[in-house]
Curated annotation (Swiss-Prot):
Residues 1-20 form the signal peptide. Keywords: Cleavage on pair of basic residues, Disulfide bond, Secreted, Signal, Toxin. Contains 4 disulfide bonds. It comes from the Eukaryota. This is Conotoxin Mr15.3. One of its GO terms (molecular function) is toxin activity. Belongs to the conotoxin N superfamily. Expressed by the venom duct.
Length: 92
């Protein structure tokens, strides 16, 4: 009986109740964009690139917003970051 109770508890915890409105209608996906994403999207719409926003003009592409390097003589290197690897600016 305890195994059955545990399975029911797990199923209830996994049920995506947060995706429903109070009247039972599903809330559309996408959510509210973060301030960073809004800023990046706004710059993309205006034709302003990340290189123009960075003082150094050097960026390292990564998941999410790209990282601006401090200087133009920096290079990108893959570094471990949980749960995956990401590019990081390395300046000598």
């Amino acid at each position: 009986m305890s195994t059955l109770k545990m399975m029911l508890l797990i199923l209830l915890l996994l049920l995506p109740m947060a995706t429903f409105d109070s009247d039972g209608q599903a809330i559309p996906g996408g959510g509210i964009p973060s301030a960073v994403n809004s800023r990046v999207r706004g710059d993309e719409k205006s034709g302003r690139s990340l290189e123009k926003r960075c003082r150094s003009g050097k960026t390292c592409p990564r998941v999410g917003p790209d990282e601006c390097c401090e200087r133009s003589d920096c290079f990108c290197k893959m570094v471990p970051a949980r749960p995956y690897w990401r590019n990081k600016c390395i300046c000598l």
